[in-house]
């Protein structure tokens, strides 16, 4: 009766403490506990704390006591698993600690910690009491991962022409600290900074760029990596760069189509911008003609008349800037010859210009060719004169050699020494010239040249020259003025003052 009374007086917590203290007594044996050094769980998931005793087959596990080891508070009871009385849990962990679902091994002392939170991180101890081996204990660390929840914040409005500007920033906080990067084809720079908290760390990454219209509409993606995530988290931001392109007008590519009576003529204003631009059409020299319709960027005309001629202005604007583009429309009247395009005249002018260019080119070619041939002729003439001079000098030397040797003088030359009868010689030469045939003159001249060449070869090159020889050379030079060289022979120049000596045709 007193034992039962005492049992009634003790509450469940007292029995838990008693059993937990009893689990720390025993003796050492050869069995071992199978546990993990670190148990990792994601925030909100269930954490399994493993503790399995592996010993002899005849050994029995009496109880398994779980406690949390706190550096500040010491050992704090968590739960007690008894082979006979079942599981007893500390009221602080009521409904959070339980056994794994069946089937369960009697040697398995593992427990489940439901809905793990960051406060559950820490060191846990498992102590197993066996019979007859005694008690065994092991410690493990519970790590709770806190996945980050990234957020992306766009920077200030981007405008074309700005310098380096913040495009967006991405922040992620978790435990441990997450990794934040950027995925984009846009050229820019990124920088990161981190902040540490008691149970987590926050990382913020910023992306800077120089805005341009090519970046408008491009994706900028923040990528967050963390061990608590099954895959990277991505947040995409579409860049919006404010710009306004230059304006232009299309529709006047062929001015000849703008004639009186044409229907469906339009002018279209072309431009791009962010935000999308607005269009406005005006006429520079007055209001828009009646019947002209404005529909956004397009200006539509009724059947054309000469009144539609004028200067039209397209005005493009958005919140950033404005642009203008103007064109001149001239509506042609086919019945007015003054305004028709004279294609024939234009063709004639073009042909005339081409012909003039070709003529100028031909003149240049002719002048260049004439100068070239003139220069070549001068060179040939100069060369010919040099050769002729050399030939004359050789002939003079041969004649001199022929007359200086008295043994080589023919008998027919005796008549030349009769200095007292010049008149008779002159008369005879005149008669002889009139009576001789051309063939005789050619033969006699060739004979004389051959005789001179033969006698020149017989002379000694080392013979000295006297003053008398020089006088004779001068006379021979004067006599050679009456000869002409043709085809390697000397021919007498046709003159009435020539002296014919003998019948062999020697002219002096």
From Swiss-Prot:
Identification of the protein by name: Nectin-4
Principal location class: membrane
Region of interest called Disordered, as start-end residue ranges on this chain: 398-445
Origin organism lineage: Eukaryota, Metazoa, Chordata, Craniata, Vertebrata
Protein keywords: Cell adhesion, Cell junction, Cell membrane, Disulfide bond, Glycoprotein, Immunoglobulin domain, Membrane, Repeat, Signal, Transmembrane, Transmembrane helix
SUPFAM superfamilies: Immunoglobulin
Subcellular location per the Swiss-Prot or TrEMBL entry: Cell membrane; Cell junction, Adherens junction
Pfam family, one: C2-set_2
Gene that encodes it: Nectin4
TM stretches of this protein: 348-368
Residues listed as glycosylation sites in the UniProt record: 280
Biological process, per Gene Ontology: cell-cell adhesion; negative regulation of natural killer cell mediated cytotoxicity; symbiont entry into host cell
């Amino acid at each position: 009766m007193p034992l039962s009374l005492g049992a009634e007086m003790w509450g469940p917590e007292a029995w838990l403490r008693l059993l937990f203290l009893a689990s720390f007594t025993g003796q050492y044996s050869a069995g071992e506990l199978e546990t993990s050094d670190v148990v990792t769980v994601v925030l909100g998931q269930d954490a399994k704390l493993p503790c399995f005793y592996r010993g002899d087959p005849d050994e029995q596990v009496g109880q398994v006591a779980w406690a949390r080891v706190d550096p500040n508070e010491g050992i704090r009871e968590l739960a007690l698993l008894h082979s006979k009385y079942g599981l007893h849990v500390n009221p602080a962990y009521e409904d959070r600690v339980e056994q794994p679902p069946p089937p369960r091994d009697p040697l398995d002392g593992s427990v489940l910690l439901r809905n793990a939170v960051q406060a559950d991180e820490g060191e846990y101890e498992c102590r197993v009491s066996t019979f007859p081996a005694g008690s065994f204990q092991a410690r493990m660390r519970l790590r709770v991962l806190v996945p980050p929840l990234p957020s992306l914040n766009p920077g200030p409005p981007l405008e074309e022409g700005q310098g380096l500007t913040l495009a967006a920033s991405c922040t992620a906080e978790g435990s441990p600290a997450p990794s934040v990067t950027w995925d984009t084809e846009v050229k820019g720079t990124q920088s990161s900074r981190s902040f540490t908290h008691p149970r987590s760390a926050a990382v913020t990454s910023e992306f800077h760029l120089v805005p341009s219209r090519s970046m408008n509409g491009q994706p900028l993606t923040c990528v967050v990596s963390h061990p608590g995530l099954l895959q990277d988290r991505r947040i995409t931001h579409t860049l919006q760069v404010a710009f306004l392109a230059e304006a232009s007008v299309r529709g006047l590519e062929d001015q000849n189509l703008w004639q009186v009576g044409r229907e469906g003529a339009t002018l279209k204003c072309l431009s791009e911008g962010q935000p999308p631009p607005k269009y406005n059409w005006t006429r520079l020299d007055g209001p828009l003609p009646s019947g002209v319709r404005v529909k956004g960027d397009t200006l539509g005309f009724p059947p054309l008349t000469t009144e539609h001629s004028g200067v039209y202005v397209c005005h493009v604007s958005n919140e950033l800037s404005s642009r203008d583009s103007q064109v001149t429309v001239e509506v042609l009247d086919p019945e007015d010859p003054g305004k028709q395009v004279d294609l024939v005249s234009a063709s004639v002018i073009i042909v005339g210009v081409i012909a003039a260019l070709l003529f100028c080119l031909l003149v240049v070619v002719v002048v260049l060719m004439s100068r070239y041939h003139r220069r070549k002729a001068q060179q040939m003439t100069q060369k010919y004169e040099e050769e002729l001079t050399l030939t004359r000098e050789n002939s003079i030397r041969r004649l001199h050699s022929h007359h200086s040797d008295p043994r080589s003088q023919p008998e027919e030359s005796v008549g030349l020494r009769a200095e007292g009868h010049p008149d008779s010689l002159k008369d005879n030469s005149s008669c002889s010239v009139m009576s001789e045939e051309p063939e005789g003159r050619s033969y006699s001249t060739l004979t004389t040249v051959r005789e001179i060449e033969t006698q020149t070869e017989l002379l000694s090159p080392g013979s000295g020259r006297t003053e008398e020889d020089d006088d004779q050379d001068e006379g021979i030079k004067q006599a050679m003025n009456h000869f002409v060289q043709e085809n390697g022979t000397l021919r007498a120049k046709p003159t009435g003052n020539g002296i014919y000596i003998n019948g062999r045709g020697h002219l002096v």
